[in-house]
């Protein structure tokens, strides 16, 4: 029938108040629809998109005219439309509806039939349910309607196509259509109840989903009841809800939700689309899920769904209380005229509508509505649920129940409990009917049935085959419309769910129990469920994230999921394709954590809830589980076994989702526990383990609060991880079904960790005590201590590794006490220092073998503590100390100097020699002073050198009696004993020799240096140990670039200049390497030339000539001048051969031209020489010469000109070199002491010094400058 003809012919005011008319119309329309759909399937199967545009886009004025005519019939609705400005929305009628309405002959009868049919269901449902919802619910619904109008239209658009697909499918298969009708009507009821405004939009969706609308007839009876409630509360609201869509279609869709005929009002084209939808399983799934299930699930739709969930649950919950009466009052539908008006446009095939309505009647309308609510609510609430999940855990769900259902929350819960027994008896009969009826029996799975009807016989076959399974699967699918793969198992789950729900609803509380199941969580559950549908997998991953190993181990240890596997295997086959959907749906059912349970258990969720219901936490799941019980009865023995394992397997659900329904079921339980345990693990890993070991009921109940709190976060995290994490987790969960072993393993793991930690703690305590007790232990003890610490350090590391491995259970971390952790940290640092010290020890100094680990720790810790204290007392910048390093080299062999030196321990020197900078040039900076700076303690540990202003007890390295003379902050010259000092000095001398031989940086023992040198300044100045190894030019180039970049990053001019000078030294070394390697592409002359420019730039940063210039600036200028001088001289030497050539060539040229020059009076002739004399140059000008010359001006060849210029440039280098040298000499007079020490240490620098000597000399001076300026 033509949809518009239907609207036109449909007299909204004419009300078919009698069930007889409805039944007759149903039958007729169903038959017609089946015929038309079958005929049109081929025609439209491939020619039309699932979701067509509004007719208006195609029809234009014609459509507008039809719509106007239709609207003209709605006298009562006009005011509402005008007032609420819904006309625009009503105008939007799906495109496909018009072209797809080729069967006009059905219009007259179809419209009245549908009208009668639609209206009575509304009235029937309205009468019982109208009184049911409190006026407040109605108000909320009306308000929601307003809010949903906006979101619903888009959703309805999406729904139109799905509904069309469903309609065609429904016509193709009456049973399916019935199921679909129930689902859609249920969804519509949800939408309607959720939001009257949404209902118009839903109406559009229903229009798109003719089957859904047909389904909505029984469901619409409940929905109509709700609408009637709205009407009773405020007729305008109900009308508004109907008209809210703003288009006749929408209005009709509103009615369609109530009577489902509006769904049939869709033209055969829509049905053909339905057939196309069949081709596209995704479309099926979406219609099944709800109006918003259109492949395009717009966020608007989801929000509207969320509103529906919250409000729809309220109204629906309210309806639940009166749903049984609503079912009985289907005959009373005539009362709800406005709803009929809104529905007028939807159904296009009266016979199909009739059949669908009948089937939907068979199915408990309330149940269908509930299912619809669940899918739509879930779909919309998935996103919200992630957010809500934090607060929408079972605790939140209960408040939400109260909020959404207000009075009905408790009623719903009670109804659920009541419905459980009823559902159990009812479900078997419903499941018992034909396989399609089994789908109907799924009732709540109407959405899945719709999608299934979209999939036509395929869905039906499987749904009938796996009624119980499909019941569970469809429910899972309901939360989210899934792609075709999910259609079958979603439908199956829906069927199973619907079956249980239908049974419960049939019992009289069937609607209420199912609604209660979804409603107890009402808003939150759908939202949470949908959020979990999205986050369920994610939640599962969330737990893995928090405790991936724990969950894996637990799930692996759990065999229970396998027990559920037999039952779930069949579902798995279907669910395998729709595993994602299942998980989502399950999530939708379950609340934050329970949703996950349900996700894995969805198929088995119903039986499981019975067990879970025992736990307070499982209250929602209990409500959900009650219908599952019905399923259990339907599925017979399978549910019961699942129930038992599920409590044990809360963790499994995450992983089960992906593995399959069977496994998912136990996992859902496990997952619930996992969530709680996860939250607990967040709180306390051990607790989570214990909780997991505890029966699931205990875990879910006891841990619910924690898990709820954590679940929110987990959900968010898990949402990210949902797909991948849930898949992996599911697999693990299956393996982990027996979580009891997991806790044991975790506990064991934790216990070792704890033991290790305790041991570490004990050691730390011992170290602290020893540090305080024995700050000056003998070096001998210290020496053994180092190796011991090494071993101990390695042991703690191993333990740490174990802890890290075991950390999947965060118990270890949580068990760490702050104090213990604090103790461990220093201990670790000490160990690291010890290890570094040992590594740094010269080959000659072998660390003493570990003798007493505790003692060693004590000695090392005390030694280190002393060092740290000393270092703290004496800041690393030791500018006063570094003066005597040069002498230290000479006196390194003298024991007395070292022993007497109060400022330094030889060990410090020895270890300091170790720390060699990669630069190799400036690496020489001693750790204590230049290298370590603020890091002296750390580097001291590595270099075992800690230089302090008053002499630091670095005493770290000793061959046998390791140094650590415990020259504490005071670092007395005797260093505890003369023997110790002697040993230290001997060792240091040996070590230094070895280090020097190995070209390691040598730290001149500052203590020894002062004795050797009369000046204390020399003693204090450290000497850099330079690496004699030869590197290629690239190595030096890299070093130079590093220093240059470092200088570029500095803002302080002096530090910048020093670093530029240091970089220039590296460039100089690079040039020197180029000289050695003739294959170098770049000329060393060029490198030197560029280095000169860099030095000159560095000198410009500080005006040493200024009266305000500091001694440091002048010292730096001296070093730069020395360097420049030698560089210039070196450049001259490199070009000396060229200069000689140029000189000879020029001399020859002048000789050849001597005769000519003699003939011409010129200054050259005046001197009688080839070279001009100053007198001749002064007396004779070129002009005079030219004037005297008859031949005219003398031309010089270009070659000679270039040669002369090159000759001048080369020879000028010598001049510059000497000039800079003289400048350096002048400035040196102002700092004789500094440069005297430098000359003494490094040897005097001359103009004939090699580039290597120059680099080392200047670098040593720069090091001292850094120390003086505290730049190290």
Swiss-Prot record:
<dbReference type="InterPro" id="IPR043639">
    <property type="entry name" value="AF4_int"/>
</dbReference>
<feature type="region of interest" description="Disordered">
    <location>
        <begin position="842"/>
        <end position="903"/>
    </location>
</feature>
<keyword id="KW-0507">mRNA processing</keyword>
<dbReference type="Pfam" id="PF05110">
    <property type="entry name" value="AF-4"/>
</dbReference>
<feature type="modified residue" description="Phosphothreonine">
    <location>
        <position position="478"/>
    </location>
</feature>
<keyword id="KW-0694">RNA-binding</keyword>
<feature type="compositionally biased region" description="Basic and acidic residues">
    <location>
        <begin position="818"/>
        <end position="829"/>
    </location>
</feature>
<dbReference type="Pfam" id="PF18876">
    <property type="entry name" value="AFF4_CHD"/>
</dbReference>
<feature type="modified residue" description="Phosphoserine">
    <location>
        <position position="391"/>
    </location>
</feature>
<comment type="similarity">
    <text>Belongs to the AF4 family.</text>
</comment>
<keyword id="KW-0508">mRNA splicing</keyword>
<feature type="region of interest" description="Disordered">
    <location>
        <begin position="418"/>
        <end position="491"/>
    </location>
</feature>
<dbReference type="InterPro" id="IPR007797">
    <property type="entry name" value="AF4/FMR2"/>
</dbReference>
<dbReference type="GO" id="GO:0008380">
    <property type="term" value="P:RNA splicing"/>
</dbReference>
<protein>
    <recommendedName>
        <fullName>AF4/FMR2 family member 2</fullName>
    </recommendedName>
</protein>
<comment type="function">
    <text>RNA-binding protein. Might be involved in alternative splicing regulation through an interaction with G-quartet RNA structure.</text>
</comment>
<feature type="compositionally biased region" description="Basic residues">
    <location>
        <begin position="630"/>
        <end position="640"/>
    </location>
</feature>
<keyword id="KW-0597">Phosphoprotein</keyword>
<feature type="region of interest" description="Disordered">
    <location>
        <begin position="201"/>
        <end position="225"/>
    </location>
</feature>
<dbReference type="GO" id="GO:0006397">
    <property type="term" value="P:mRNA processing"/>
</dbReference>
<dbReference type="GO" id="GO:0043484">
    <property type="term" value="P:regulation of RNA splicing"/>
</dbReference>
<feature type="compositionally biased region" description="Basic and acidic residues">
    <location>
        <begin position="151"/>
        <end position="160"/>
    </location>
</feature>
<feature type="compositionally biased region" description="Low complexity">
    <location>
        <begin position="439"/>
        <end position="452"/>
    </location>
</feature>
<feature type="compositionally biased region" description="Pro residues">
    <location>
        <begin position="874"/>
        <end position="883"/>
    </location>
</feature>
<feature type="compositionally biased region" description="Polar residues">
    <location>
        <begin position="97"/>
        <end position="107"/>
    </location>
</feature>
<feature type="region of interest" description="Disordered">
    <location>
        <begin position="93"/>
        <end position="183"/>
    </location>
</feature>
<dbReference type="GO" id="GO:0016607">
    <property type="term" value="C:nuclear speck"/>
</dbReference>
<feature type="compositionally biased region" description="Polar residues">
    <location>
        <begin position="576"/>
        <end position="586"/>
    </location>
</feature>
<feature type="compositionally biased region" description="Polar residues">
    <location>
        <begin position="161"/>
        <end position="183"/>
    </location>
</feature>
<dbReference type="Pfam" id="PF18875">
    <property type="entry name" value="AF4_int"/>
</dbReference>
<feature type="compositionally biased region" description="Basic and acidic residues">
    <location>
        <begin position="616"/>
        <end position="629"/>
    </location>
</feature>
<feature type="compositionally biased region" description="Pro residues">
    <location>
        <begin position="844"/>
        <end position="853"/>
    </location>
</feature>
<feature type="region of interest" description="Disordered">
    <location>
        <begin position="535"/>
        <end position="687"/>
    </location>
</feature>
<dbReference type="GO" id="GO:0002151">
    <property type="term" value="F:G-quadruplex RNA binding"/>
</dbReference>
<keyword id="KW-0539">Nucleus</keyword>
<dbReference type="InterPro" id="IPR043640">
    <property type="entry name" value="AF4/FMR2_CHD"/>
</dbReference>
<feature type="region of interest" description="Disordered">
    <location>
        <begin position="779"/>
        <end position="829"/>
    </location>
</feature>
<feature type="region of interest" description="Disordered">
    <location>
        <begin position="283"/>
        <end position="302"/>
    </location>
</feature>
<feature type="compositionally biased region" description="Pro residues">
    <location>
        <begin position="426"/>
        <end position="438"/>
    </location>
</feature>
<feature type="compositionally biased region" description="Basic and acidic residues">
    <location>
        <begin position="543"/>
        <end position="558"/>
    </location>
</feature>
């Amino acid at each position: 029938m033509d949809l518009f003809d239907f609207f036109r012919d449909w007299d909204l005011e004419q009300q078919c108040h009698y069930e007889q008319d409805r039944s007759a119309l149903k039958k007729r329309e169903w038959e017609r629809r089946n015929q038309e759909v079958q005929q049109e399937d081929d025609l439209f199967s491939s020619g039309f998109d699932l979701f067509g545009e509004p007719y208006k886009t195609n029809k234009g004025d014609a459509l507008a005219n039809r719509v106007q005519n239709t609207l003209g019939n709605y006298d009562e609705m006009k005011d509402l439309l005008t007032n609420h400005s819904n006309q625009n929305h009503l105008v939007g009628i799906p495109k496909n509806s018009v072209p797809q309405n080729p069967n006009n002959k059905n219009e007259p009868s179809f419209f009245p039939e549908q009208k009668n049919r639609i209206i009575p269901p509304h009235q029937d449902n309205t009468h019982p349910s109208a009184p049911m919802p409190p006026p407040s619910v109605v108000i909320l619904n009306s308000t929601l309607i307003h809010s949903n109008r906006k979101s619903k239209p888009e959703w309805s658009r999406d729904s139109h196509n799905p509904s069309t697909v469903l309609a065609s499918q429904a016509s193709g298969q009456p049973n399916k259509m019935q199921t679909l009708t129930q689902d859609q009507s249920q969804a519509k009821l949800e939408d309607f109840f959720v939001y009257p405004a949404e209902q118009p939009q839903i109406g559009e969706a229903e229009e798109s989903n003719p089957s859904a609308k047909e389904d909505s007839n029984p469901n619409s009876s409940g929905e109509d009841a709700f609408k009637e409630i709205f009407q009773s509360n405020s007729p305008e609201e109900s009308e508004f809800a109907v008209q809210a869509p703003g288009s006749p279609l929408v209005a009709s869709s509103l009615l369609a939700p109530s009577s489902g005929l509006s769904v049939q009002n869709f033209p055969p084209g829509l049905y053909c689309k339905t057939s196309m939808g069949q081709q596209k399983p995704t479309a099926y799934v979406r219609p099944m899920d709800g109006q918003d299930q259109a492949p395009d699930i717009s966020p608007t739709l989801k929000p509207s769904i969320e509103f529906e969930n919250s409000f729809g649950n309220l109204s629906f919950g309210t309806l639940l209380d009166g749903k049984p009466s609503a079912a009985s009052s289907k005959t009373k539908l005539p009362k709800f005229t406005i709803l009929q008006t809104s529905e007028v446009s939807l159904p296009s095939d009266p016979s199909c509508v009739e059949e669908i309505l009948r089937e939907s009647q068979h199915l408990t309308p309330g149940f269908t509505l509930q299912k619809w609510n669940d899918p739509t609510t879930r779909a919309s609430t998935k996103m919200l649920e992630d957010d809500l999940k934090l607060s929408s855990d079972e605790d939140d769900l209960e408040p939400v129940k109260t909020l959404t259902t207000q009075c009905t929350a408790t009623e719903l819960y009670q109804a659920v409990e009541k419905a459980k027994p009823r559902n159990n008896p009812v479900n078997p009969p419903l499941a018992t009917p034909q396989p399609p009826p089994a789908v109907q029996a799924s009732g709540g799975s109407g959405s899945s049935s719709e999608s299934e009807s979209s999939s036509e016989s395929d869905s039906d076959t499987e749904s009938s085959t796996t009624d119980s399974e499909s019941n569970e699967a469809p429910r899972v699918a309901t939360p989210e419309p899934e792609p075709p793969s999910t259609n079958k198992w979603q439908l199956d789950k829906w069927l199973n769910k619907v079956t249980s729900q239908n049974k419960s609803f049939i019992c009289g509380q069937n609607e209420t129990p199912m609604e209660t199941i979804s409603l107890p969580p009402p808003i939150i559950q759908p939202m949470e469920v949908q959020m979990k549908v999205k986050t369920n997998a994610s939640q599962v991953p969330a737990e893995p994230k928090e405790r991936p190993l724990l969950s894996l181990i637990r799930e692996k240890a759990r065999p229970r999921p396998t027990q559920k596997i037999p039952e779930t295997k069949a579902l798995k086959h279907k669910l395998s394709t729709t595993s994602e959907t299942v998980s989502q749906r399950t999530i939708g059912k379950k609340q934050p954590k329970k949703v996950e349970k349900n996700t894995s258990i969805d198929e088995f969720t119903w039986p499981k809830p019975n067990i879970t219901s025992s736990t307070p936490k499982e209250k929602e799941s209990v409500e959900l589980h009650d219908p599952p019980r019905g399923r259990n009865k339907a599925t017979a023995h399978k549910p019961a076994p699942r129930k038992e394992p599920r409590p044990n397997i809360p963790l499994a659900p995450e992983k089960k989702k992906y593995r399959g329904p069977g496994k998912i079921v136990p996992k859902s339980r496990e997952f619930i526990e996992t969530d709680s345990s996860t939250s607990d693990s967040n709180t306390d890993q051990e607790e989570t383990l214990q909780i997991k070991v505890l029966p699931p009921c205990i875990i879910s109940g006891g841990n619910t609060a924690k898990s709820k709190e954590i679940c929110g976060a987990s959900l968010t995290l898990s949402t990210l991880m949902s797909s991948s994490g849930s898949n992996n987790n599911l697999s693990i969960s299956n393996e982990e079904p027996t979580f009891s072993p997991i806790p044991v393993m975790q506990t064991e793991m934790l216990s070792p960790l704890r033991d290790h930690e305790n041991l570490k703690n004990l050691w730390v305590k011992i170290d602290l005590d020893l540090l305080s007790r024995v700050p000056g232990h003998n070096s001998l003890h210290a020496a053994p201590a180092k190796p011991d610490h090494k071993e101990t350090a390695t042991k703690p590391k191993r333990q740490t590794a174990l802890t890290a491995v075991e950390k999947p259970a965060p118990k270890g971390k949580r068990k760490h006490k702050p104090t213990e952790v604090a103790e461990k940290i220093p201990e670790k640092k000490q160990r690291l220092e010890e290890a570094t010290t040992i590594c740094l020890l010269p080959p000659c100094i072998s660390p003493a073998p570990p003798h007493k680990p505790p003692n060693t720790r004590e000695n090392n810790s005390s030694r280190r503590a002393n060092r740290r204290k000393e270092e703290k007392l004496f800041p690393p910048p030791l500018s006063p100390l570094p003066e005597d390093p040069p002498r230290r080299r000479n006196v390194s062999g003298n024991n007395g100097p070292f022993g007497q030196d109060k400022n330094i321990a030889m060990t410090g020197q020895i270890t300091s020699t170790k720390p060699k900078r990669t630069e190799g040039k400036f690496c020489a900076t001693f750790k204590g002073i230049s290298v370590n700076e603020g890091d002296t303690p750390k580097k001291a540990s590595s270099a075992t050198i800690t230089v302090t202003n008053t002499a630091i007890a670095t005493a770290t390295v000793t061959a046998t009696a390791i140094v650590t003379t415990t020259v504490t902050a005071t670092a007395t010259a005797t260093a505890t004993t003369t023997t110790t000092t002697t040993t230290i000095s001997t060792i240091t001398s040996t070590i230094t020799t070895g280090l020097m031989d190995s070209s390691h940086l040598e730290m001149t023992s500052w203590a020894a240096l002062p004795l050797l040198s009369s000046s204390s300044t020399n003693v204090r100045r450290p000497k850099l140990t330079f690496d004699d190894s030869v590197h290629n030019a690239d190595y030096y180039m890299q070093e130079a670039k590093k220093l240059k970049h470092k200088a570029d990053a500095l803002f302080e001019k002096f530090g910048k200049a020093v670093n530029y000078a240091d970089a220039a030294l590296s460039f100089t070394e690079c040039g020197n390497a180029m000289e050695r390697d003739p294959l170098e592409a770049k000329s060393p002359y060029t490198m030197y030339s560029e280095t000169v420019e860099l030095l000159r730039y560095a000198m410009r940063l500080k005006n040493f000539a200024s009266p305000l210039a500091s001694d440091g600036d002048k010292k730096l200028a001296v070093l730069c001048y020395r360097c420049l001088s030698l560089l210039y001289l070196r450049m001259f030497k490199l070009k000396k051969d060229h200069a000689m050539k140029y000189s000879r060539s020029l001399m020859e040229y002048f000789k050849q031209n001597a005769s000519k020059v003699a003939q011409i009076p010129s200054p050259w002739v005046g001197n009688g020489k080839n070279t001009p004399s100053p007198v001749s140059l002064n007396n004779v000008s070129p002009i005079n010469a030219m004037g005297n010359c008859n031949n005219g001006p003398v031309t010089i060849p270009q070659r000679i000109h270039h040669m002369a210029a090159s000759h001048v440039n080369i020879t000028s280098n010598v001049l510059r070199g000497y000039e800079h040298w003289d400048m350096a000499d002048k400035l040196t007079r102002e700092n004789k002491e500094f440069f005297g020490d430098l000359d003494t240490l490094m040897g005097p620098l001359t103009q004939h010094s090699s580039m290597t000597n120059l680099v080392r000399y200047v670098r040593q001076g720069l090091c001292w400058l850094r120390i003086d300026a505290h730049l190290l």
